[in-house]
Amino acid sequence: MKFAAVVVLAAAAAAVSAETNAQRMARGLPPKAPIRRHGTPADTEKRSHPSSTGGGQCNTGPIQCCNTVATSGSQSGVDELLTLLGLSVPVGTQVGASCSPISAVGTGSGAQCSGQTVCCEQNEWNGLVNIGCMPINLNA
């Protein structure tokens, strides 16, 4: 019983000692920061987590399996293909030829690639030429 009386007395003392910002400013003190008692809609929204970029992830589209990956301007035959298709690519850009998307990484036959696995920025002519390719390792 004594414990309950002490708790009630402490709660009453805490409630009495709370002063308003108007009282603080009247005494020449700065106002206290506002207390947020309820969450804002932004606080209560479900937070999404960004996907990882490692381990076979590709942010620009599906992972591609290309038979040939070469640098434009390196006399590798890719330049002739780009010219025939009427595509203008800056010198030094990685270009993949004869590419097909890899649908399911790590499961079944969809993850098999006998060429080079790449992540490309631009897919032209239905996989015949992929521009802006970067080799990736599916085993990472």
From Swiss-Prot:
Tell me which positions the record assigns to the signal sequence. Answer: 1-18
State the gene name recorded for this protein.
Answer: hydPt-1
**What organism does the UniProt record list as the source?**
Pisolithus tinctorius (Dead man's foot)
Alphabetical keyword list: Cell wall, Disulfide bond, Secreted, Signal
**Protein name (Swiss-Prot/TrEMBL):** Class I hydrophobin 1
Coiled-coil regions, chain positions: none
Q: What does this protein do?
A: Aerial growth, conidiation, and dispersal of filamentous fungi in the environment rely upon a capability of their secreting small amphipathic proteins called hydrophobins (HPBs) with low sequence identity. Class I can self-assemble into an outermost layer of rodlet bundles on aerial cell surfaces, conferring cellular hydrophobicity that supports fungal growth, development and dispersal; whereas Class II form highly ordered films at water-air interfaces through intermolecular interactions but contribute nothing to the rodlet structure.
Principal location: secreted
Q: How does it assemble?
A: Self-assembles to form functional amyloid fibrils called rodlets. Self-assembly into fibrillar rodlets occurs spontaneously at hydrophobic:hydrophilic interfaces and the rodlets further associate laterally to form amphipathic monolayers.
Gene Ontology cellular component list? extracellular region; fungal-type cell wall
Q: Name one Pfam family in it.
A: Hydrophobin
